[in-house]
């Protein structure tokens, strides 16, 4: 069972985003899709619904609503959480790293 989400360090999360996510994702409103979708407005949205991004059927069919907890669970092991996703990221195994990244994403994508 994945660890429960706990608010982390936004600053450490920003560093994690820059080193682990920025090559494929943007967070600002109106930001471009890259290899992965722009993440602005992701919280409260269902998986596979960022306008203008070509998702796999797996992402569209999963239908998960992104919350701090579901995002943390996903980031632990994306390919296990959504089998068939094209996200080529092995995941963040440490709950603290996931908490920090999700805390950053919650603010940066709002």
Swiss-Prot record:
**Which Gene3D superfamilies has this protein been placed in?**
Cytochrome c-like domain
According to its UniProt record, how is this protein modified after translation? Binds 1 heme c group covalently per subunit.
The source organism is: Candida albicans (strain SC5314 / ATCC MYA-2876)
**Family membership noted in the UniProt record:** Belongs to the cytochrome c family.
Q: Which residues form a coiled coil?
A: none
Q: Which residues cross the membrane?
A: none
What is the recorded name of this protein? Cytochrome c
- The N6,N6,N6-trimethyllysine modification is found at 79
UniProt KW keywords? Electron transport, Heme, Iron, Metal-binding, Methylation, Mitochondrion, Respiratory chain, Transport
- Give the record's GO biological process terms: filamentous growth; mitochondrial electron transport, cytochrome c to oxygen; mitochondrial electron transport, ubiquinol to cytochrome c
User: In UniProt terms, what function does this protein have?
Assistant: Electron carrier protein. The oxidized form of the cytochrome c heme group can accept an electron from the heme group of the cytochrome c1 subunit of cytochrome reductase. Cytochrome c then transfers this electron to the cytochrome oxidase complex, the final protein carrier in the mitochondrial electron-transport chain.
Question: Where found?
Answer: Mitochondrion intermembrane space
Which parts of the sequence bind heme c?
21, 24-25, 87
Which PROSITE patterns has this protein been placed in?
CYTC
Q: Name one Pfam family in it.
A: Cytochrom_C
Q: Name one GO cellular component term.
A: mitochondrial intermembrane space
Question: GO molecular function terms here?
Answer: electron transfer activity; heme binding; metal ion binding
């Amino acid at each position: 069972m994945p660890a429960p989400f706990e608010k982390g360090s936004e600053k450490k999360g920003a560093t994690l985003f820059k080193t682990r996510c920025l090559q494929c994702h943007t967070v600002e409103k109106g930001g471009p899709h890259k290899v992965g979708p722009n993440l602005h407005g992701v919280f409260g949205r269902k998986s596979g619904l960022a306008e203008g991004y070509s998702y796999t059927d797996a992402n569209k069919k999963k239908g998960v609503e992104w919350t701090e907890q579901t995002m943390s669970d996903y980031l632990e092991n994306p390919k296990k959480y959504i089998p068939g996703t094209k996200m080529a990221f092995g995941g963040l195994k440490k709950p603290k790293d996931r908490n920090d990244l999700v805390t950053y994403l919650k603010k940066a994508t709002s």
